[in-house]
């Protein structure tokens, strides 16, 4: 069943590559670009076609199979998705291309390119299109369009959807995937129109809207959003990424007119408070760098919204910001957006629960015999869930520290190395410090950071389980 589903997913990626083909046709690009795209499509069709020839008798997907399908799918899609860049010569290195498209599908937005103008329009579009597909999840997208998606495929969605809890918004799995994707694509389309009306060229409005929707961060120009020189566009992008950093289940509740469920959500309230407090602190701390409070607020809101939602759109140089403001951004890198959103990171809900666990631990010292319960949205969080979140946080920190230790061999700049690891593992994109490109890192570090991006997007476990012998046993 693993082989069969992975083969179908490769065929889906082949179909998706027809999108940049149409862009290349519109812009009348060179034959080299067409050869690169059709060569990749041919490889995917050949491998996918061979894999679906024999349909498996047992189509049941268990937890282990679900984890393997998700992990292998993201690795394969990233590898094959990078081949057009290699075949066209626009990113000659296979490792660099794998890094770039891993960054795309995981909606990280980190890049090895110092100059994005080297890319043709079609591959520039494909790079950002991977944000749109990866935003709600490659497998969620696949299940939304597959005609035979079954509730047994819930194990696949559990392994991919970000956040500590996965729930169906309606009874049927396929309907859940379709509802989530319709909401997602509806909001994406809205922001394409908004950006276009705000003054962006149509091509740019699609690219930036895809980055906004997927909370990815790839742009059309080297200077990012600053290229447009518009405060209106800056504010719209800030608002847009914050919208996509909210749990999509809440938008579904809003559609059902369950207004109390939306505004009463503890994670949403914490998310808004963190954004407001962080923006206020950075605004005050950077007043001396800008002409007036309004510009300082604009820049602070843009950076805070882009970091907490793990979007990472670029806007100017923040290396001259006070260290206090830079450390606030580094802190926000660890938090991330809401569970069930397109944002990466640890997630606000986990931070909220960890804070409440710490509070209860302190209270238990003061009152040893008192029975303490932990509530989120008036729901009791049982001890098992609390322990799972604590274990996840411990593994999260161990991986972060291990990656910093290894990647530090490439650079002596603590802020660059630390923010690069946080940026990749939390799917954020930019590096704090003297560089904005990951081209400075060695091939080994790029491979590690590529897997860090995929591991971070899949909540660690699917990638870790790939390296366990028991995962591959038939028992």
Describe these PLM feature segments:
Residues 1-475:
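Membrane-proximal intracellular helices of multi-pass ion channels
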């Amino acid at each position: 069943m693993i082989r069969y589903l992975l083969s179908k997913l490769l065929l889906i990626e082949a179909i998706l590559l027809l999108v940049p083909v149409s862009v290349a046709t519109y812009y009348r690009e060179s034959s080299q670009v067409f050869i690169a795209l059709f060569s990749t499509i041919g490889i995917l069709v050949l491998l996918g076609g061979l894999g679906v020839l024999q349909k498996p008798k047992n189509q049941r997907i268990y937890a282990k199979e679900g984890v393997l399908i998700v992990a292998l799918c993201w690795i394969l899609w990233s590898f094959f998705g990078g081949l057009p860049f290699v075949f066209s010569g626009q990113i000659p290195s296979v490792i660099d291309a794998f890094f770039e498209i891993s960054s795309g599908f995981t909606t990280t937005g980190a890049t090895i390119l110092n100059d994005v103008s080297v890319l043709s329009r079609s591959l520039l579009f494909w790079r950002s299109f991977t944000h749109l597909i990866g935003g709600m999840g490659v497998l969620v997208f696949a299940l939304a369009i597959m005609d035979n998606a079954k509730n047994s495929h819930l194990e696949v969605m559990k392994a991919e959807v970000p956040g500590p809890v996965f729930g169906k918004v309606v009874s049927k799995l396929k309907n859940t995937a379709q509802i989530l994707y319709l909401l997602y694509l509806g909001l994406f389309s809205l922001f394409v129109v908004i950006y276009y009306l705000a003054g962006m060229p149509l091509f740019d409005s699609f690219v930036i809207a895809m980055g906004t929707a997927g909370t990815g961060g790839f742009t059309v120009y080297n200077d990012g959003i600053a290229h447009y020189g518009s405060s209106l566009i800056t504010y719209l992008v800030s608002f847009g990424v914050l919208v996509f950093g909210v749990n999509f289940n809440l938008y579904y509740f809003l559609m059902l007119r369950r207004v109390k469920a939306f505004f009463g959500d503890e994670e949403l309230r914490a998310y808004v408070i963190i954004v407001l407090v962080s923006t206020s602190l950075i605004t005050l701390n950077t007043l001396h760098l800008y002409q007036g409070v309004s510009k300082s607020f604009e820049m602070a809101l843009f950076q805070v919204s882009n970091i907490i939602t793990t979007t990472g759109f670029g806007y100017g140089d923040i290396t001259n910001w006070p260290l206090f403001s830079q450390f606030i951004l580094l802190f926000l890198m660890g938090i991330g957006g809401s569970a069930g959103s397109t944002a990466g990171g640890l997630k606000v809900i986990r931070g909220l629960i960890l804070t409440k666990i710490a509070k209860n631990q302190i209270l238990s010292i003061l009152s040893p015999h008192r029975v303490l319960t932990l509530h989120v949205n008036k729901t009791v969080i049982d001890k098992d869930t609390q322990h799972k979140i604590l274990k996840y946080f411990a593994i999260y920190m161990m991986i972060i520290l291990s990656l910093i230790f290894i990647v530090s061999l490439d650079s002596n700049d603590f802020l660059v190395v630390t923010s690069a690891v946080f940026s990749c593992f939390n799917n954020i994109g930019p590096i704090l410090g003297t560089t904005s490109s990951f081209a400075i890192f060695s091939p080994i570090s790029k491979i590690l950071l590529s897997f860090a991006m995929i591991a971070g997007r899949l909540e660690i476990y699917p990638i870790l389980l790939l390296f366990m012998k028991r995962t591959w046993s038939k028992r």
